[in-house]
UniProtKB/Swiss-Prot annotation:
GO molecular function, one term: cAMP binding
Xref: InterPro entries: CLZ_dom (IPR032406), CNG_cation_channel (IPR050866), cNMP-bd_CS (IPR018488), cNMP-bd_dom (IPR000595), cNMP-bd_dom_sf (IPR018490), Ion_trans_dom (IPR005821), RmlC-like_jellyroll (IPR014710)
Entry-linked PROSITE patterns: CNMP_BINDING_1, CNMP_BINDING_2, CNMP_BINDING_3
Record bears the keyword Transmembrane helix: yes
Compartments in which it is found: Cell projection, Cilium membrane
Organism phylogeny: Eukaryota, Metazoa, Chordata, Craniata, Vertebrata
Topology in the lipid bilayer: Multi-pass membrane protein
Protein's UniProt name: Cyclic nucleotide-gated channel alpha-2
Organism: Bos taurus (Bovine)
Length: 663
């Protein structure tokens, strides 16, 4: 009723605000309120402000056109500023209790430490900071993908065009377009690198001078500058069909490797990507080797011996596709050390083949090592899971378990593997810090925790402790989760599957529990006065395979040890639930409260007696210590007096006698 009343009262104000002129600057509270609006409100604001624009423009129809246009531009600029600035999504209040206030992007104050003297300078600096790319962000990754394309194009086609003249001359218009498009991307990448932030003391640096200095003093900057030197001007001297003058474009290779590294960390299938990446590297090496073989054959002379490429005057070997495929075939046979190629004849041919064989051995070793390790990593999870199954099978055979039970266990393992539920979450997340583990657990179990009634008013710290203690469990068809009369030591939350509340015969069904339901939460609290006591009141059985989250009583008690207030809130919440359901014996509660008061009084008396005994012992120790100190002081005073008397006596004996007077 309060929320509805508040909504009714606030609606006129909201309607009034729609007719108010848009403000260019707002106070801090207004900015905060605007930033916390949901994004769905943007459409309403847009339509209302455009309607306002039309209403403001209507009375001006008969006035001058220039004035109407100026007013229109001003309102549009204000509308664009308010609607296109960054807005944060509305946070989940339940989630915020776990996570605390979110850290917004913190801009470091760089340079000489002096701020801008006027607001215009600050606005300009903030506008420039919008173009600083976060190297861990999505836009930077998309740019890496874009820059990797021209790099890969140059590494694959530039050398092929330099070696195969037919490829260069037949499509030189296409190559010119692609070359200069890649040059534009290279130049743009140089400016992007100047606007790419980096972390300093954990914060993203956005100062322009620092970004520029950080990039310029690296080796990569020198390579990037060398890769955009306009060597194409040499075309005027040697001709347009000499693409080898653009070999400096190959120096931009680091961006392609960076894209591959980031993709490997982002992809959900890193092993497959590593294999694909390895195959790409091998294909590029074979491609380059084929081009070099063709270039050597051209320099020696086509068909002069059996090792070089056959004479291109032969129609069978005189067209482009056959030239490239033949060279690629020769390169593949050589680098894979298969052989079966014509032996070299000249010394330079021998040297090239020896070099190829060495490269081939390295490639073969790399392939065997990398592919072997990748396959081992891909099968590591399966091998570990299979080892568990084998151990269980061996145990069941040793203990002569029945075939039906053995088949049931095997089906349970099959269900875990088929539905990807064989991962031990605690083992996987143990390498993460506690904060990240809590964040992941909250994101995974948030919707589940919201359905538990007793956790609605708990402290955020306790909820974080509890969410880390939830353990997933999988039950097979027909398994009993709990039986009537059992002592309740766990509470369960159903993630997937269906459970039935059945009679003692196990057949008659009283109720059906589905995903999102929870049970057993009251029994683990040990609430005094509960008519259920600490025992289960129903039989709950799994109809199929069911995924449940379990929270044990020991884990709950361990968590609430450090949160006594939260424990009291949990017990009060549990009493309210029991009272609503008529399961709380108020007389027993009152009696237990009286017993608690009596126990507290007895405990207080015991504590008072203990304190009195300790005080008396301390007083006796103090009195004894005081007497000892007095005795020591008396002894010291006596010794001091005796020393003073001895000193005065010795001074009298050592003093000279006065001389006798003469008569």
């Amino acid at each position: 009723m309060t929320e509805k009343a508040n909504g009714v009262k606030s609606s006129p104000a909201n309607n009034h605000n729609h007719h108010a002129p848009p403000a260019i600057k707002a106070s801090g509270k207004d900015d905060h309120r605007a930033s916390s609006r949901p994004q769905s409100a943007a459409a309403d604001d847009t339509s209302s402000e455009l309607q306002q624009l039309a209403e403001m423009d209507a009375p001006q129809q008969r006035r001058g056109g220039f004035r109407r246009i100026a007013r229109l531009v001003g309102v549009l600029r204000e509308w664009a500023y308010r609607n296109f600035r960054e807005e944060e999504p509305r946070p989940d209040s339940f989630l915020e209790r776990f996570r605390g206030p979110e850290l917004h992007t913190v801009t470091t104050q760089q340079g000489d430490g002096k701020g801008d003297k006027d607001g215009e300078g600050k606005g300009t600096k903030k506008k420039f900071e919008l173009f600083v790319l976060d190297p861990a962000g999505d836009w930077y990754y998309r740019w890496l993908f874009l820059i990797a394309l021209p790099v890969l194009y140059n590494w694959c086609l530039l050398v092929a065009r330099a070696c195969f003249s037919d490829l260069q001359k037949g499509y030189y218009i296409v190559w010119l377009v692609l070359d200069y498009v890649s040059d534009v991307v290279y130049i743009a990448d140089l400016f992007i690198r100047l606007r790419t932030g980096f972390l300093e003391q954990g914060l993203l640096v956005k100062d322009t001078k620092k970004l520029r200095d950080n990039y310029i003093h690296t080796m990569q900057f020198k390579l990037d500058v060398a890769s955009i030197i306009p060597t194409d001007l040499i075309y005027f001297a040697v001709g347009i069909h000499n693409p080898e003058v653009r070999f400096n474009r190959l120096l931009h290779f680091a961006r392609m490797f960076e894209f591959f590294d980031r993709t490997e960390t982002r992809t959900s299938y890193p092993n497959i990507f590593r294999i694909s990446n390895l195959i790409l590297y091998i294909l590029i090496i074979i491609h380059w080797n084929a081009c070099i073989y063709y270039a050597i054959s051209k320099s020696i002379g086509f068909g002069v011996d059996t090792w070089v490429y056959p004479n291109i005057t032969d129609p069978e070997y005189g067209y482009l596709s056959r030239e490239y495929i033949y060279c690629l075939y020769w390169s593949t046979l050589t680098l894979t050390t298969i052989g079966e190629t014509p032996p070299p004849v000249k010394d330079e041919e021998y040297l090239f083949v020896i070099f190829d064989f060495l490269i081939g051995v390295l490639i073969f070793a790399t392939i065997v090592g990398n592919v072997g390790s990748m396959i081992s990593n891909m099968n590591a999870t399966r091998a570990e899971f299979q080892a568990k199954i084998d151990a269980v099978k061996h145990y069941m055979q040793f203990r002569k378990v029945s075939k039906e039970m053995e088949a049931k266990v095997i089906r349970w393992f099959d269900y875990l593997w088929t539905n990807k539920k064989s991962v031990d979450e605690r083992e996987v997340l143990k390498n993460l810090p506690a904060k990240l583990r809590a964040e992941i657990a909250i994101n995974v179990h948030l919707s589940t925790l919201k359905k538990v009634r007793i956790f609605q008013d708990c402290e955020a710290g306790l909820l974080v402790e509890l969410v880390l203690k939830l353990r997933p469990q999988v039950f097979s068809p027909g398994d009993y989760i709990c039986r009537k009369g059992d002592i309740g030591k766990e509470m369960y939350i159903i993630k997937e599957g269906k459970l039935a509340v059945v009679a003692d015969d196990g057949v008659t069904q009283y109720a059906l529990l589905s995903a999102g339901s929870c049970f057993g939460e009251i029994s683990i609290l040990n609430i005094k006065g509960s008519k259920m006591g600490n025992r289960r009141t129903a039989n709950i059985r799994s109809l199929g395979y069911s995924d449940l989250f379990c929270l044990s009583k020991d884990d709950l008690m361990e968590a609430v040890t450090e949160y006594p207030d939260a424990k009291r809130v949990l017990e009060e919440r549990g009493r309210e639930i029991l009272m609503k359901e008529g399961l709380l014996d108020e007389n027993e509660v009152a009696a237990s409260m009286e017993v608690d008061v009596q126990e507290k009084l007895e405990q207080l008396e015991t504590n008072m007696d203990t304190l009195y005994t300790r005080f008396a012992r301390l007083l006796a120790e103090y009195t004894g210590a005081q007497q000892k100190l007095k005795q020591r002081i008396t002894v010291l005073e006596t010794k001091m007096k005796q020393n003073n008397e001895d000193d005065s006596l010795s001074d009298g004996m050592n003093s000279p006698e006065p001389p006798a007077e003469k008569p």
